[in-house]
Amino acid sequence: MQLAPAIPVLRIFCVEKAKEFYLDFLGFTLDWEHRFEPELPLYAQVHRDGLILHLSEHHGDATPGSTVFARVEDIVALQNELTDKRYGYSRPEAIHVGWGLQMEIADPFGNRLRFCQQIEG
């Protein structure tokens, strides 16, 4: 038996804001959306490269203010890509931490995406 990578579930409150942030700004791709009925809350999956996230409007699925820790190979390239988009609510910046580089970005719902690149040596 082998465990698969975890898929974090993040609470969202506005589908339009979530799509603007995760798809337009961060560059994720929408894989699928689900609603039990058209007026009911959204549950969706997005991905970028190997990082998969579930986004949910459902009250009991997740708590706002969660943090996702995601490893990246070139955090400076990601920082430059995101900065070039001139998103009005975030200007992410990689900082040095004891073991490498880290860049934390808050989504519109209080969740934090902590991108990290380990530096050898």
Q: Predicted regions: what is each one?
A:
Residues 1-5, 13, 36-53, 104, ...:
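C-terminal "cap" of GNAT-fold acetyltransferases
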Residues 9-11, 29-37, 94-96, 120-121:
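Conserved catalytic-core motifs of GNAT/GCN5-like acyltransferases
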Residues 24-30, 87:
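Conserved acetyl-CoA-binding loop of GNAT-fold acetyltransferases
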Residues 31-66, 113-117:
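Conserved short beta-strand elements that form part of the metal-binding/catalytic scaffold
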